[in-house]
Amino acid sequence: MPDNLTEEKAVTWVKSILALNLNTIENDTEVLDQGGVFALIGPTGVGKTTTTAKLAARYVMKHGTKNLGLITTDAYRIGGHEQLRIYGKILGVMVHAVKDEADLKIALNELKNKHTILIDTVGVSQRDRMVAEQIAMLSNTNMPIKKLLCLNATSTGETLTDVIRAYKGKGLDGCLMTKLDEAATIGNALDVIIKEKLKLYYVANGQRVPEDIHLANKQYLIQHALKLSASSNQSFQFLNDELPFVMGDTVNAANASQLSGMSYA
């Protein structure tokens, strides 16, 4: 930090450095417009299925159902794929359930003419050997798959670092931050994302589909991460009524009332 800065200028300097190092996408072009195959990966309970449904709904509202494909690898757990199937039925998009690399290759071949394919993966603890198997399965297909890691904003910095390093495998294309509505602080998550040089695509702050997913707005995220809460003396805390201002533009959910009424853990 430069010497002889006033407190106000020092804070401004810190914000500018954080903004310079926090890599985010500016709009939906990199996902919904550009298209491709995207796999949402991460530990159990981080919100992968709901986030996949939110992205699917966001795509349908912008481009329609014809060129969207949905795949779930959660075929082993009893009822594991049913949640995404319900969303798929509402959206009018068939969900393909796969259980191994061979199934995945078949499903991708069937969907090869789709503009965008979203893959919801089974949740695996970062310390489970199945993580390596899952990454290998996603890496050994005939189509390039972009791997987006879902990070729980309520987790500690140590846990998030552990998750990222376990799932990195042959490389991550980016991440999404989930459960912002449950987090007392987002400083840990932002710190780890910056240190691990991950691109932050979206943030999710609730269970509603498709409303509760937003493009990450780095200026607001940093501003609120640096706030101190006088009542709790905790850094990086922001209030629930501030959440809408932390995010980028939300989608217009006027045509998704059916989805809005659905809520899953």
Regions found by a protein language model. Give the residues of each.
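Primarily NTPase-proximal linker/entry elements flanking Walker-type ATP/GTP-binding cores
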Residues: 1-68, 72-75, 86-87, 91-93, ...
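Residue-level signature of catalytic and energy-coupling elements of molecular machines
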Residues: 49, 74, 84, 120, ...
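Conserved catalytic network of the ASCE P-loop NTPase/AAA+ motor domain
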Residues: 61-63, 88-91, 109-113, 139-143, ...
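Conserved beta-strand/loop subsegment of P-loop NTPase cores
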Residues: 67-69, 143-151, 168-183, 187-205, ...
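Conserved nucleotide-binding/hydrolysis micro-motifs of P-loop NTPases
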Residues: 75-78, 102-103, 123-126, 153-157, ...
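Conserved ATPase-coupling elements of RecA-like P-loop NTPase cores
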Residues: 80-81, 126-134, 159-161, 186-188
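Inter-motif core of Ras-like GTPase G domains
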Residues: 109-116, 130-154
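NTP-binding/hydrolysis catalytic cores, primarily Walker-type P-loop NTPases
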Residues: 193-265
